[in-house]
């Protein structure tokens, strides 16, 4: 009898193991047989493969896209080509997790790419989402595939993500007997613009959109990116500032503006209050540069922080927010034309691969704005259809963003209120915007940028600390986020968290009230 009592736990454990193996085998078998079950218009399945967690995938990609990706959890990986016109197709992947939560999610892209965001596919599938991602209708990060190829360009503007969602939802229903309960979109930068395109042109296609650092006002953005080269000139010109010079400018901006939020912590909480005066850095007579700037360089700084206006003084794009100079200088003020802008005018605006980007003028911006193919501006300020659909949109923008000015997101917010005739509180019912102090472009930065918008910023999956899960709670429980809590890492994700800070819902801003020091999250208040 005693022997039997000892055997029972063993038998129970063995049965559990056998059951787990059986479930896993069923999932793997379902995956390996899945390709033969897919019969959708315009969809050609390349393969459906079971990928166990911890696998390091080698990706068949062009050199400018990801070459490998560690898969965090067991998935069924489905790769396919989807025809979008007689002259275009997208490469689409769906990652179906074994530990499925009944949620569907589409990822976005970045830059002018061209590249499936495999890290986002892994991040969302690890969290239990059936996840899709596409290559935006072309391969690589260059704009050259747009050259005399309007169908490829149309895929880039909107059709790739929309098609991926339509096909992805069908596949999810086919793969899982229970289908899906809720649907989401997650993207940043170009991915942010794609999220806004969904909101503007396909309201209700997903239940929740997380759209970070959005490249909306897209042609204005590329014009703004292009206009820095005429301001700074090439390396070595009188108007050019070295990286050391920009470090000097950054320290002076902090001296003038850091304390305006109540704490000197190297982070500017509200750039709207900061209007840098670079004349304080002007070299005295006889002084050598290195710890000061020439009058010509001072003028360069002031021009960099001015908005971009058309030839008739109409706003094209707002100013670069001050406070992120150490990130912006190597990317935007490096003495070379900005690559994405150069590609846009060469392969889209003028269809002339020999066009000289160093000759860019405001007239080129105006020509591009008149063109605006497929309304890539993504600047429609009436989101009434999105509101009426019941869908939610959460957007965020880093206040040290070096590639897309956070002022553009604020400009759009105010355009929404004016166009729709609503108050901030009314907008909050379906649209919330969070300024993330100390965050550069979509990730990294000097402050509490760990908000879970991607794997590279994740420290928690609690809704208070993770924008994706905050959206899930908003959609599924009706609890909208009041703040987004970010983590300041000592040395990137996975390192020690130095402090936390709650980022405010716009138009509120963070103010240090004390009594603790600036690392105490309770010492800050949204006002």
Curated annotation (Swiss-Prot):
Q: What task does this protein carry out?
A: Involved in degradation of plant cell walls. Hydrolyzes the feruloyl-arabinose ester bond in arabinoxylans as well as the feruloyl-galactose and feruloyl-arabinose ester bonds in pectin.
Q: Where in or outside the cell?
A: Secreted
* Record GO terms (molecular function): carboxylic ester hydrolase activity; feruloyl esterase activity; metal ion binding
Q: What is one term from the GO cellular component aspect held by the record?
A: extracellular region
Name the domain of life this protein comes from. Answer: Eukaryota
UniProt source species: Emericella nidulans (strain FGSC A4 / ATCC 38163 / CBS 112.46 / NRRL 194 / M139) (Aspergillus nidulans)
| Catalyzed reactions per annotation | feruloyl-polysaccharide + H2O = ferulate + polysaccharide
User: In the UniProt record, does the keyword Iron occur?
Assistant: no
InterPro entries reported in the protein's UniProt record: AB_hydrolase_fold, Tannase/feruloyl_esterase
Q: List the disulfide bonds.
A: 31-76, 65-115, 188-442, 257-274, 283-292, 504-526
Gene from which the chain derives: faeB
Q: Where does this protein hold Ca(2+)?
A: 258, 261, 263, 265, 267
Annotated active site: 189, 401, 441
Q: Does the keyword ATP-binding apply?
A: no
**EC number from the UniProt entry:** 3.1.1.73
Q: What is this protein called?
A: Probable feruloyl esterase B
**Its family?**
Belongs to the tannase family.
In this protein, the residues bearing a glycan are 56, 86, 139, 277, 312, 356
Class of enzymatic activity (EC top level) = hydrolase
| Alphabetical keyword list | Calcium, Carbohydrate metabolism, Disulfide bond, Glycoprotein, Hydrolase, Metal-binding, Polysaccharide degradation, Secreted, Serine esterase, Signal, Xylan degradation
**Which residues are the signal sequence here?**
1-19
Q: Which GO terms describe its biological process?
A: xylan catabolic process
